[in-house]
Amino acid sequence: MVRGSILLVMIAFLGGGSAPPPTILAGPASYADLVVLALGAPVVVRATIAKAARIAPDQAAGVAAGSARVLVKATLTTAILAPADVPAAIEYLADVPVDIRGKPLQLKGADTLVFLRGGAGGYALANARGQIGWSAATEAAVRRVIAEARRADPVITGVGNAFHVAGSVPGEAESQFFLTTADSKPVSLVVLSRPGEAKRLSVALGEVIDEAAGGVAKETLLWYRLACFLPRVLPGEASGDAALAADYAFVLQVLGPCGRTLP
Protein backbone atom coordinates (compact mmCIF):
# COMPACT_ATOMS: atom_id res chain seq x y z
CA MET A 1 0.00 0.00 0.00
CA VAL A 2 1.29 3.45 -0.84
CA ARG A 3 2.26 5.44 2.26
CA GLY A 4 2.20 9.20 2.71
CA SER A 5 -0.22 11.41 0.86
CA ILE A 6 -3.22 9.88 -0.83
CA LEU A 7 -2.22 9.71 -4.47
CA LEU A 8 -4.05 9.67 -7.77
CA VAL A 9 -2.58 6.99 -10.00
CA MET A 10 -3.03 7.06 -13.77
CA ILE A 11 -3.44 3.73 -15.56
CA ALA A 12 -1.12 3.50 -18.55
CA PHE A 13 -2.86 3.27 -21.90
CA LEU A 14 -2.02 3.27 -25.61
CA GLY A 15 -2.91 6.31 -27.68
CA GLY A 16 -4.96 6.23 -30.82
CA GLY A 17 -7.43 9.05 -30.46
CA SER A 18 -9.64 7.37 -27.89
CA ALA A 19 -10.46 9.08 -24.61
CA PRO A 20 -8.13 8.16 -21.74
CA PRO A 21 -9.41 5.75 -19.11
CA PRO A 22 -10.48 7.24 -15.79
CA THR A 23 -7.91 7.92 -13.14
CA ILE A 24 -7.96 5.26 -10.49
CA LEU A 25 -8.30 6.85 -7.08
CA ALA A 26 -6.03 5.15 -4.58
CA GLY A 27 -7.24 4.13 -1.14
CA PRO A 28 -6.04 5.72 2.10
CA ALA A 29 -2.38 5.48 3.03
CA SER A 30 -3.23 3.61 6.25
CA TYR A 31 -6.06 2.25 8.36
CA ALA A 32 -5.62 5.24 10.68
CA ASP A 33 -6.26 7.61 7.76
CA LEU A 34 -9.44 5.71 6.97
CA VAL A 35 -10.59 6.20 10.57
CA VAL A 36 -9.86 9.94 10.33
CA LEU A 37 -11.99 10.16 7.19
CA ALA A 38 -14.85 8.03 8.52
CA LEU A 39 -15.12 9.73 11.91
CA GLY A 40 -14.81 13.20 10.45
CA ALA A 41 -17.66 12.94 7.95
CA PRO A 42 -21.39 12.97 8.72
CA VAL A 43 -22.08 11.73 5.18
CA VAL A 44 -20.23 8.84 3.51
CA VAL A 45 -21.25 7.59 0.08
CA ARG A 46 -20.09 5.41 -2.75
CA ALA A 47 -20.47 7.20 -6.07
CA THR A 48 -19.33 7.17 -9.69
CA ILE A 49 -17.82 10.39 -10.99
CA ALA A 50 -19.81 11.61 -13.99
CA LYS A 51 -17.89 14.82 -14.63
CA ALA A 52 -15.08 16.90 -13.18
CA ALA A 53 -14.97 20.46 -14.53
CA ARG A 54 -11.97 22.64 -13.79
CA ILE A 55 -12.53 25.84 -11.83
CA ALA A 56 -10.73 28.86 -13.28
CA PRO A 57 -7.48 29.47 -11.36
CA ASP A 58 -8.50 33.04 -10.49
CA GLN A 59 -11.59 31.61 -8.78
CA ALA A 60 -9.76 28.84 -6.93
CA ALA A 61 -7.85 30.41 -4.07
CA GLY A 62 -5.46 28.35 -1.99
CA VAL A 63 -4.83 25.55 -4.47
CA ALA A 64 -1.40 23.99 -4.01
CA ALA A 65 1.13 24.00 -6.82
CA GLY A 66 0.71 20.98 -9.07
CA SER A 67 -3.02 20.75 -8.36
CA ALA A 68 -6.24 22.09 -9.82
CA ARG A 69 -9.66 22.63 -8.31
CA VAL A 70 -12.52 20.85 -10.01
CA LEU A 71 -16.26 20.73 -9.55
CA VAL A 72 -17.09 17.05 -9.29
CA LYS A 73 -20.50 15.78 -10.34
CA ALA A 74 -21.10 12.23 -9.20
CA THR A 75 -23.90 9.69 -9.36
CA LEU A 76 -24.81 8.04 -6.08
CA THR A 77 -24.31 4.29 -5.87
CA THR A 78 -25.13 3.82 -2.19
CA ALA A 79 -25.23 5.89 0.99
CA ILE A 80 -23.11 4.29 3.70
CA LEU A 81 -23.73 6.95 6.35
CA ALA A 82 -26.21 9.80 6.11
CA PRO A 83 -28.52 11.61 8.56
CA ALA A 84 -31.04 12.17 5.75
CA ASP A 85 -31.70 11.08 2.18
CA VAL A 86 -28.85 11.74 -0.25
CA PRO A 87 -29.85 12.83 -3.77
CA ALA A 88 -29.05 10.63 -6.74
CA ALA A 89 -26.65 13.28 -8.09
CA ILE A 90 -24.22 15.18 -5.87
CA GLU A 91 -21.66 17.92 -6.45
CA TYR A 92 -18.59 18.99 -4.49
CA LEU A 93 -15.25 20.72 -5.02
CA ALA A 94 -11.99 18.78 -4.93
CA ASP A 95 -8.34 19.63 -5.48
CA VAL A 96 -6.67 17.06 -7.72
CA PRO A 97 -3.18 16.72 -9.23
CA VAL A 98 -2.50 17.93 -12.76
CA ASP A 99 -0.61 16.02 -15.44
CA ILE A 100 2.55 17.13 -17.23
CA ARG A 101 0.42 19.36 -19.47
CA GLY A 102 -1.09 21.10 -16.47
CA LYS A 103 -4.48 19.48 -16.94
CA PRO A 104 -6.43 17.75 -14.14
CA LEU A 105 -6.26 13.99 -14.27
CA GLN A 106 -9.22 12.24 -15.87
CA LEU A 107 -11.76 11.37 -13.18
CA LYS A 108 -14.85 10.57 -15.23
CA GLY A 109 -16.02 7.04 -14.52
CA ALA A 110 -13.99 6.60 -11.33
CA ASP A 111 -15.66 4.51 -8.61
CA THR A 112 -15.12 6.38 -5.37
CA LEU A 113 -15.87 6.63 -1.68
CA VAL A 114 -16.61 10.23 -0.72
CA PHE A 115 -16.57 11.66 2.80
CA LEU A 116 -18.78 14.74 2.94
CA ARG A 117 -20.37 17.37 5.13
CA GLY A 118 -23.45 19.38 4.25
CA GLY A 119 -26.87 18.34 3.04
CA ALA A 120 -29.62 19.28 0.65
CA GLY A 121 -28.19 22.79 0.25
CA GLY A 122 -24.91 21.41 -1.08
CA TYR A 123 -22.00 19.19 -0.14
CA ALA A 124 -18.29 19.70 0.53
CA LEU A 125 -15.48 17.27 1.24
CA ALA A 126 -15.16 16.83 5.00
CA ASN A 127 -11.41 16.39 4.52
CA ALA A 128 -9.30 17.75 1.68
CA ARG A 129 -8.43 14.13 0.85
CA GLY A 130 -11.93 12.82 1.38
CA GLN A 131 -12.27 11.33 -2.11
CA ILE A 132 -10.69 7.89 -2.33
CA GLY A 133 -10.96 4.86 -4.56
CA TRP A 134 -13.69 2.35 -3.84
CA SER A 135 -13.03 -1.31 -3.19
CA ALA A 136 -15.11 -3.89 -1.40
CA ALA A 137 -12.44 -4.18 1.30
CA THR A 138 -12.24 -0.42 1.84
CA GLU A 139 -16.01 -0.06 2.07
CA ALA A 140 -16.17 -2.94 4.54
CA ALA A 141 -13.49 -1.28 6.68
CA VAL A 142 -15.39 2.03 6.65
CA ARG A 143 -18.57 0.27 7.73
CA ARG A 144 -16.69 -1.42 10.60
CA VAL A 145 -15.29 1.91 11.79
CA ILE A 146 -18.75 3.50 11.76
CA ALA A 147 -20.27 0.52 13.61
CA GLU A 148 -17.51 0.52 16.24
CA ALA A 149 -17.88 4.28 16.74
CA ARG A 150 -21.55 3.78 17.59
CA ARG A 151 -20.54 1.55 20.51
CA ALA A 152 -19.04 4.66 22.14
CA ASP A 153 -15.87 2.93 23.35
CA PRO A 154 -13.53 5.16 25.38
CA VAL A 155 -11.50 7.83 23.59
CA ILE A 156 -7.92 7.54 24.86
CA THR A 157 -6.19 10.76 25.93
CA GLY A 158 -3.09 9.54 27.77
CA VAL A 159 -1.63 7.57 30.67
CA GLY A 160 -2.64 8.35 34.25
CA ASN A 161 -1.13 6.03 36.86
CA ALA A 162 1.03 2.95 36.45
CA PHE A 163 2.68 0.40 38.69
CA HIS A 164 4.87 -2.70 38.44
CA VAL A 165 4.75 -5.69 40.80
CA ALA A 166 7.24 -8.55 40.87
CA GLY A 167 5.80 -12.05 41.22
CA SER A 168 6.55 -14.76 43.75
CA VAL A 169 8.99 -16.56 41.43
CA PRO A 170 11.92 -15.14 39.44
CA GLY A 171 10.85 -13.79 36.06
CA GLU A 172 7.22 -13.32 37.04
CA ALA A 173 5.87 -9.76 37.05
CA GLU A 174 2.90 -7.61 36.14
CA SER A 175 2.66 -4.00 35.01
CA GLN A 176 -0.61 -2.10 34.89
CA PHE A 177 -1.18 1.17 33.08
CA PHE A 178 -4.34 3.12 33.87
CA LEU A 179 -5.29 5.30 30.94
CA THR A 180 -7.06 8.64 30.86
CA THR A 181 -10.07 8.99 28.58
CA ALA A 182 -12.18 11.85 27.26
CA ASP A 183 -15.28 10.63 29.10
CA SER A 184 -13.49 9.25 32.20
CA LYS A 185 -14.40 5.66 31.32
CA PRO A 186 -11.91 3.20 32.87
CA VAL A 187 -9.36 1.62 30.56
CA SER A 188 -6.25 -0.23 31.66
CA LEU A 189 -3.44 -2.11 29.98
CA VAL A 190 -1.82 -5.11 31.63
CA VAL A 191 1.55 -6.58 30.71
CA LEU A 192 2.07 -10.02 32.23
CA SER A 193 5.46 -11.74 32.37
CA ARG A 194 5.85 -15.40 33.37
CA PRO A 195 8.88 -17.71 33.22
CA GLY A 196 9.00 -19.72 30.02
CA GLU A 197 6.14 -17.78 28.44
CA ALA A 198 6.02 -14.89 26.01
CA LYS A 199 5.19 -11.54 27.54
CA ARG A 200 1.50 -10.76 27.03
CA LEU A 201 -0.51 -7.55 26.66
CA SER A 202 -4.21 -7.39 27.52
CA VAL A 203 -6.70 -4.54 27.78
CA ALA A 204 -9.54 -4.09 30.24
CA LEU A 205 -12.46 -1.82 29.39
CA GLY A 206 -14.04 -1.48 32.82
CA GLU A 207 -13.36 -1.48 36.53
CA VAL A 208 -12.48 -5.18 36.72
CA ILE A 209 -9.00 -6.16 35.56
CA ASP A 210 -8.94 -9.83 34.62
CA GLU A 211 -5.95 -11.88 33.49
CA ALA A 212 -8.28 -13.47 30.94
CA ALA A 213 -8.90 -10.09 29.26
CA GLY A 214 -8.18 -10.12 25.56
CA GLY A 215 -5.50 -8.35 23.60
CA VAL A 216 -5.85 -5.52 21.11
CA ALA A 217 -6.85 -6.54 17.59
CA LYS A 218 -5.13 -4.58 14.83
CA GLU A 219 -7.18 -2.36 12.53
CA THR A 220 -9.95 -1.76 15.04
CA LEU A 221 -11.08 1.55 16.49
CA LEU A 222 -9.67 0.58 19.89
CA TRP A 223 -6.29 -0.17 18.32
CA TYR A 224 -6.34 3.19 16.50
CA ARG A 225 -7.08 5.09 19.69
CA LEU A 226 -4.27 3.34 21.53
CA ALA A 227 -1.64 3.33 18.78
CA CYS A 228 -2.27 6.93 17.75
CA PHE A 229 -2.91 8.64 21.07
CA LEU A 230 -0.77 6.97 23.71
CA PRO A 231 2.36 9.04 24.48
CA ARG A 232 5.67 7.71 23.21
CA VAL A 233 7.13 7.74 26.74
CA LEU A 234 5.56 7.34 30.17
CA PRO A 235 4.71 10.65 31.81
CA GLY A 236 5.73 11.80 35.28
CA GLU A 237 7.46 9.64 37.87
CA ALA A 238 6.57 6.40 36.09
CA SER A 239 9.13 7.20 33.39
CA GLY A 240 11.91 6.70 35.96
CA ASP A 241 10.93 3.11 36.75
CA ALA A 242 13.03 0.90 34.47
CA ALA A 243 10.68 -2.10 34.67
CA LEU A 244 7.61 0.03 33.91
CA ALA A 245 9.41 1.78 31.07
CA ALA A 246 10.42 -1.57 29.56
CA ASP A 247 6.88 -2.92 29.73
CA TYR A 248 5.46 0.30 28.29
CA ALA A 249 7.93 0.01 25.41
CA PHE A 250 6.56 -3.51 24.91
CA VAL A 251 3.02 -2.08 24.75
CA LEU A 252 4.04 0.32 22.00
CA GLN A 253 5.87 -2.45 20.15
CA VAL A 254 2.80 -4.71 20.20
CA LEU A 255 0.53 -1.90 19.03
CA GLY A 256 2.89 -0.88 16.25
CA PRO A 257 3.02 2.51 14.50
CA CYS A 258 -0.10 4.60 14.11
CA GLY A 259 0.49 5.32 10.42
CA ARG A 260 -1.74 8.39 10.34
CA THR A 261 -0.87 10.94 7.65
CA LEU A 262 -4.07 13.01 7.57
CA PRO A 263 -4.75 16.02 9.81
What are these regions (language model features)?
Residues 5-15:
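Bacterial N-terminal signal peptides
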Residues 15-263:
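Transition segments tied to proteolytic processing and entry into folded domains
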